[in-house]
Amino acid sequence: MRSYDFIVIGSGIAGLSFALRAAAHGSVVIATKRSAEQGSTSWAQGGIACVQSQEDSFDIHVADTLEAGAGLCDEAVVRTIVTEAPAAMETLMDYGVVFDKRMDEEGHEELDLGREGGHSKRRILHSKDTTGREVESKLLALVKEHPGITLLEQHFAVDLITTAKLGLAGPNRCVGVYVLDQAAGLVRTLRSDRIVLCTGGCGRVYQYTTNPDIATGDGVAMAWRAG
């Protein structure tokens, strides 16, 4: 059994960005069931919507999102994501992510903002048409060279370990995770009081999907079983 301050399951943009921040506060391990770059992030094209221009605003972006969401969006969540997006983009750029730029009418360099369906303003930051690959490659390079982060590739998260499953008294909480070391054919135990599921979605449960074949909802199932 190996113990860490933080366990991260998944190696896409969510898992890698969390690991880089958490590493300032303790030891981190990332467990991912394939090679680290094979998550859905690398397949993401388009770009990232973020208010960047004077003609745009948070309120306009929120309104566009709510209209496109057709009543399915939680407005508070939408507003939080929209208002925190500029700082998140600055963090990505600090990590070395390069978004496409252009020259304005006065010869100054600026972000080459795109406009996609459902957006009334130009607000899409992109890196050609392979934005996800650019983000993934830069974050993964930083993770691999960070002395406080351990990356376990080909380690399939099998199940969360909870106090209830161990028969311990008190409120049920997660204390670790079982992972299958696919190279060795062994189930290993990772121990931590802080476990973050960054396992993506479950698009592959449907017959027709553009999701990669790893999007099988493993994290969703583990969370449900943990209660």
Give names to the regions the model predicted.
Residues 2-4, 184-194:
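Core beta-strand elements of the Rossmann-like FAD/NAD(P) dinucleotide-binding domain
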Residues 6-30:
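N-terminal Rossmann-like FAD-binding beta1-loop-alpha1 element of flavoenzymes
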Residues 11, 155, 193-194:
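Structural detector for helix-capping/boundary residues
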Residues 17, 134, 138, 217-225:
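Short amphipathic alpha-helical face segments that pack within enzyme cores
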Residues 17-22, 40, 195, 222:
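Hydrophobic/aromatic ligand-binding patch that stacks against planar heteroaromatic rings
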Residues 23, 93, 224:
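Anion (oxyanion) recognition and catalysis
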Residues 194-227:
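Glycine-rich loop(s) and the adjacent beta-strand/alpha-helix scaffold that form part
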